[in-house]
Each structure stands twice: as C-alpha cells, then as structure tokens.
C-alpha cells in the first residue's frame, strides 16, 4: 500500500510540472476587480490543486505561481497561507484522490476498515458515507470563515 502512495506522490509532482510548464497559471489575471473576487478564485484553484497534488509539490507550485498573484491583489501573506493550508486540507479530504482518507486507511488498517464498512452497509446513505460527508461538512464552512472574515477587517 505504501507503494501506491509513493506512486500517487510521484504522479502529483508530475501533474504540478505539467501545470507549471503549460502556462495554465499565466492564464489567471494578475489583477481582479475586488479582493473578495480574488480570494474566491484563488481558494477554488487551491482546493483543486489540493485534490490532485501531494502537499510538497502543491506548496512549491503555489509559492512560485499563485502567491505573487494573491499579494498583488491585496491579500495579506499570512492570511493567504492560512487560506492555502485550509484549502489544501479540504482538497486532501475530497475525491478524486482523497489523500487524507487513504493515509487514514493505511494507519487504521484494512481489517478495521472492512469491519466498519460491514457495520454500516445496511444503514442510511449518511452512515454509509459518513467518513466522506462529515469532514466536508466541517471543512467547507471553516474554509469560508478563514477566507472571508479577515478580508472584512483589512480589505480596501
């Protein structure tokens, strides 16, 4: 199983290289009409990056390409990196890769996960998919708070 995680990390680093070399990040304008629009677009991009890349490659990609755009649009550096961390965590909890779900499965073990799946197989939709839904129900409002509340205090 650890080989699958290493393969996943290698693939995500290569995806980061493809994104960087393709010029996709240059398509994002350097200036937006409002800091709120900039924050919204940036956190959507960051969640997407968190969904498909490992943490190390994602931080390198963001610090080289997205961070300067955020700074030029008036987002404070500390606030920006808090948005990055929270967005990445939401991405790591979300499909298609769900890296944190995979790592948790590795730590807990296949036997325990199969037992837990067997216990909830006959229950409602929520109980079947609780380990996917509950983190998303917590992280989405948390991300919205982290992104927008500080902007009300320092945005121009």
Q: Which residues make up each language-model segment?
A:
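Alpha-helical transmembrane segments of multi-pass membrane transport proteins
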Residues: 1-156
